[in-house]
């Protein structure tokens, strides 16, 4: 009597003999099924972007601290309100990215704790100028990251954060416009 075994049955036998051995190559359909598993959002593909995400978290937290500091020194109630709102939004961005980090790694991200120090606030217009450029660069960096990642969900999140950063830059420009005398 002839024994006809499928490739899967043969593979199972070899797995019992030596679990590290793969004597039968994976078929194209098995590879496609394995690839389909890795396509999901925040999966293996997103691991490549984990250092970028860490950097974005730290940047958002730094921006939040800066906005809170600038809000305390703002010359007008409108400026104080805007900077408090921007600080809250930057904190929200950091929390979102920390959630993304957890989805990818299964670990809670612990941000670096800055050493307390005296914050030197330059002239008000200079603060607005610096923050405008920081927000614009942040928008650009998120857009670039969205183009470079292979994870679809990360692409959407990075694009959303890019739009927020550009919106922040426009709000700061509006505040700066009010400071210009004609």
Q: Model-flagged regions — what are they?
A:
Residues 1-182:
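Non-heme di-metal
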